[in-house]
Design a protein with these regions (language model features):
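Generic hydrophobic alpha-helical scaffold/packing signal
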Residues: 51, 55, 76, 87-89, ...
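Domain-level recognition of nuclease-like catalytic cores that cleave nucleotide substrates
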Residues: 120-158
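Structural motif
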Residues: 82-84, 112
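Surface-exposed, flexible loop/turn segments at secondary-structure boundaries
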Residues: 20, 69, 83, 93, ...
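Accessory nucleic acid-recognition modules appended to NTPase machines
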Residues: 1-72, 76-80
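Catalytic cores of nucleic-acid endonucleases
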Residues: 90-131
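Short catalytic-loop micro-motif centered on adjacent basic/acidic residues
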Residues: 63, 85-88
Length: 158
């Protein structure tokens, strides 16, 4: 992924999501603490939280945004055989961009994707869904998943 890396195009994340919350205005902080209302910050908070967990597992953070398009992925990770888009959904989104990336002939290295949301663990249309709190288990899933899939389908069919 480093070969396509553009050092002048990047996203910034806090190493500690608590620091991100501390930068909110006082009213938003109080609303968040008292009412658990994440409001307009929900997407940024969850994306930062997942990014923080990915870094702690040793992943480098890469994202994708196609020019003049809404096609994007919050993060990308790599396994031995595949490039995996990782989406973070603040709401119960359908991960339209991820489905496009998985099914498009333009991206042959993308065979499946991972979505983090408030939903339970699930699998549909080559998208594996996990609750946010399972982010810290991603590396373990990836190691077990790749070995299982390779045994079942063979390296070329992943």
């Amino acid at each position: 992924m480093g070969g396509n890396y553009e050092p002048d195009t990047f996203k910034l994340y806090f190493a500690d999501t608590g620091l991100l919350v501390s930068m909110l205005d006082d009213e938003s902080q109080e609303d968040l603490r008292a009412n658990k209302n994440l409001g307009v910050y929900k997407g940024a908070l969850y994306e930062n939280m997942v990014g923080e967990a990915l870094i702690k597992q040793g992943y480098k953070l890469f994202y994708y945004k196609k020019e003049n398009s809404t096609l994007e992925a919050d993060f990308f990770i790599r396994s031995a055989a595949s490039l995996i888009p990782v989406e973070v959904k603040a709401k119960s989104g359908r991960a339209k961009s991820m489905k496009t990336l998985i099914t498009s002939d333009h991206y042959p290295d993308i065979r499946y994707g991972i979505k983090f949301s408030k939903n339970n663990i699930g699998h549909e249309d080559r998208i594996y869904t996990f609750p946010y709190f399972c982010t810290f288990l991603l590396k373990r899933f990836m190691l077990g998943f790749h070995a299982e899939e390779e045994a079942e389908y063979g390296e070329g069919d992943l």
